[in-house]
Amino acid sequence: MREKEVTAHDLFKAEYDSMDWCIKKTNPLYLQLQAIDKVLDEMPEILNCVHRDIAAPTGRRKLKSRFGRPVQITSEQALRCAILKQLRGYSYRELANAIDLTSVYRKFTRFYGEEVPHFTTIERVIKVISEGSLQEANRALLLLGIKKKVEDGKAIRHDTTVVQTDIMYPVDSRLLNNTVRVLTRLMSRLREAGGSVYKYSDHSRRSKKRAYQIIVGKGKNIEQRRTLLYRDLLKVQKEVVVQGEKMVALAAGHNQLSATGKSCAAQLRKLIPLAHQVYSQAWRRVIKGEKVPANEKLLSIFETHTDIICRGKKGSPAEFGHKVDFAMGKSGLVTRYEVFRGNPGDNEVIERALTDHINLFGHPPKKLTADRRYFSAANELVASDKGGEKVAIIKPGHLNAARKQLHKQPWFRHLMNWRAGIEGCLSTLLRTFGLKRCLWKSWNSFNAYVGVSVLTYNLRILAGHILQI
């Protein structure tokens, strides 16, 4: 049976401070962890959301070791490890070492004098927590903020940012070489598991050489030579894909295949359609000279959900990841976030955001502000109809006399100046809480990563308000 929590101890009682004689009790990190600990103890709903995922049958299957021994870590410890990881910016290995060596971290994560699990165990448990549960946990935390009168929801500001996926810059030659490399590796493992009947030719060296020549090629007539190199690389990739398809067909009729062989065959079956897509887009762009639409491009065979985001920013013409919309109140708490697929316009989110805001706070925001990308006449009308008294969104382009006068109003300028503060909050999320780049794999894990970062950020903001009180 999965344990939900360990026996509760007062984190800062004297009997647990024997190892902390050298720690200054006015240390900001110590006080911050103390406040976060109190918030988590006060809100069992947050732990319930996490425990539901870890204790579910699917969660138990993911956490079962090869030998059938369950992972010895409670849901509460997993939640606190996830929070500490994002709060301090640790990798999983650094997190396990820091908890093991620091008595304050041991107390915060509720390990006390127990043996700290291996970092891979901590990783597996944290990755079980779903994005839906983190959304619910964040909502429960916001309700606590409302109850403590930290946030009233009377003023709201919006902005978007891009969270990158963990991929290399997408180049056709690199994508083609990646498909050859991974297909060859899987075919090699399938042959080891299934015997010599699974035959293939290893073209990975030739593929790597062609990809390298394409990337570093210089000199005269480079475009013509690069096209010839691409033709050869495309030919190699096509040959490897054909071999992979033959191996998958053989594996389908092989009843005595081991578990490893079946796993390799399943991965081959999943990768082959992606290899066809990579071949198609490279052929269209390089050989035929077509402009491939962004929604038809595959940017990575590992993170297939990655989108191209073009926001027109100087120095970053294109970003690879997902656009995320954030709404924040006067307290600095993130009251709402939404991860998008594709690259929708920012002006499409206001109506949904207002509906969610009313569901959370019970009333519309009296003041709403956002940058010019959110502007549309429909958005201003919707905000006013839902009860917004002051809506400050700069209209791009030509302005008539009435609009110019509106932009000069003191309340309008005050709201736009206040809106600028969200840039600093987003910078903190990106730099301090790991939202610059998501290192978790798959679309669901991407959403969960954003969720745990926002939850940790809100916990720190709420803890800061509690310390001031």
Predicted segments, located by residue:
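Basic, amphipathic alpha-helical segments enriched in Lys/Arg and hydrophobic/aromatic residues
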Residues: 268-274, 410-469
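Helix-centered, glycine/charged polyanion-binding patches within enzymatic domains
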Residues: 367, 372-439
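Trp/Phe/Arg-rich N-terminal binding region typifying the photolyase-homology
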Residues: 63-75, 89-134, 146, 156
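Charged, often Cys/His-bearing segments associated with DNA-binding zinc-finger transcription factors
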Residues: 1-53, 468
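Active-site- or DNA-interface-adjacent structural scaffold in DNA-acting proteins
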Residues: 112-303
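Basic, short loop/linker segments at the boundary and entry of helix-turn-helix/winged-helix-like folds
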Residues: 30-83
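Short, conserved catalytic/metal-binding motifs centered on acidic residues
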Residues: 81, 95, 116-122, 152-164, ...
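Electropositive, glycine- and tryptophan-enriched low-complexity nucleic-acid-binding patches
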Residues: 305, 313-360
